Structures are given as C-alpha cells and as structure tokens.
Amino acid sequence: MNLELIGQLVTVALVVGAGPIIIGALFARGGNL
C-alpha cells in the first residue's frame, strides 16, 4: 500500500470521527445560549 493512500485514509477517518463530535460540541454550546 502507498503511504499517500494510508495518509488519506487516516485523514478521512479522523475527519469522519471528529466531525460529529466537534459539530455536537458547537451545537451544544449554541443551544445553551
């Protein structure tokens, strides 16, 4: 496997994994206002 491909997969995994958490945190802060 190419390191570039692995890097892209890791990046996508991090974005998909952290995206909902970040959005949820921002939504929670906005909702508490």
From Swiss-Prot:
It is a single-pass membrane protein. The chain crosses the membrane at residues 5-25. InterPro entries: PSII_Ycf12_core-subunit. It holds the Pfam family PSII_Ycf12. GO terms for cellular component: chloroplast thylakoid membrane; photosystem II. Its main location: plastid. The keyword Transmembrane helix applies. PSII is composed of 1 copy each of membrane proteins PsbA, PsbB, PsbC, PsbD, PsbE, PsbF, PsbH, PsbI, PsbJ, PsbK, PsbL, PsbM, PsbT, PsbX, PsbY, PsbZ, Psb30/Ycf12, peripheral proteins of the oxygen-evolving complex and a large number of cofactors. It forms dimeric complexes. This is Photosystem II reaction center protein Psb30. It comes from Ostreococcus tauri. The gene is psb30.
